[in-house]
Amino acid sequence: TLLATNRWAKALFIDIATGNTRPVPFNSEQIISLLIDKKGNVWVAHYNQGVSCYDRNGKQLQTYHTQNSPLKTNVVLSLEEHNGQIWMGTDGGGIHILNPQTGKISTLRYIPGDRYSLPANSILCLYNDKSDNMWAGSVRNGLINIKEVGMKTYQDVLPGQNYGLSEKTILSIYQDHDNQIWIGTDGGGINLFDPATGKFHHILSTWEEKVASITGMDKDHLLVSLFSQGLFLS
């Protein structure tokens, strides 16, 4: 069963075997991002309402917004879990990192003149890879690899070059069974990144596509969501 959301519409459970759908047991209006954490709780970012946490039965456990927490903005665009903490990519406020046990929130953000700060403050997607490194897809500032020891940013390059992206706005990220990282861009199609070599492969057949989401179905297949076109099994 998949938990899926159509941005600005409602979330649904989808039975992969039958294609049947059923509603979720929590408020699913205007959902921007969803995350199921390791405890099975569901974190939901509703547009301009911060972030709420629900148990698997739909009971609201907690909500975080600018009025009751250190969250700097209520527009949260992406959610990911890393070492038991909830990372929140925001629209203009950088990355907020929540400790669910204490409610404490720390922030990574762009600081003008500080080359060690986050390169961008609008983060559309977050991904925790198998090496426990974080990846952030930004608005017009490329792909950011965040490690304990520092950050590295990958920008767009000219067609045919393999040391950068086909498009600098990143919508989705997924690491496959072979540790290759699939990157969905906003109009540049799908890029495949090899962390071992640092090289990118631009998949030309997807050029100009807006790749809203990528995830794995099994070790040989990906499920890809293209903007305004639906889901595709690849």
Where are the regions that the model predicts?
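Carboxylate-rich, polar loop motifs that coordinate divalent cations or form catalytic acidic clusters
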Residues: T1-S234
